[in-house]
Amino acid sequence: MPKCDICGKGSIRGFQYSHSNRRTIRRWKPNIRKVRAIVDGTHVTLNVCAKCLKAGKVQRAL
């Protein structure tokens, strides 16, 4: 699974409980986007989560 290149956020695992309290393992995935960004004056493709995009931690390349 991809991780955010800015904050390092990745998927986490936990249990999904049914009505009878049976447990099955499930996974929560972050909202990861591939973004062309400017890093040190060059265009680079990064995996960035939506929270970092909204916060403006990445300068997007147009």
Curated annotation (Swiss-Prot):
Pfam families for this protein: Ribosomal_L28 (PF00830)
GO molecular function: structural constituent of ribosome
Keywords: Ribonucleoprotein, Ribosomal protein
GO cellular component: ribonucleoprotein complex; ribosome
Top-rank lineage group of the source organism: Bacteria
GO annotation terms (biological process): translation
HAMAP family: Ribosomal_bL28
NCBIfam families in the record: L28
Protein family per UniProt: Belongs to the bacterial ribosomal protein bL28 family.
Name of the protein this chain belongs to: Large ribosomal subunit protein bL28
Organism expressing this protein natively: Caldanaerobacter subterraneus subsp. tengcongensis (strain DSM 15242 / JCM 11007 / NBRC 100824 / MB4) (Thermoanaerobacter tengcongensis)
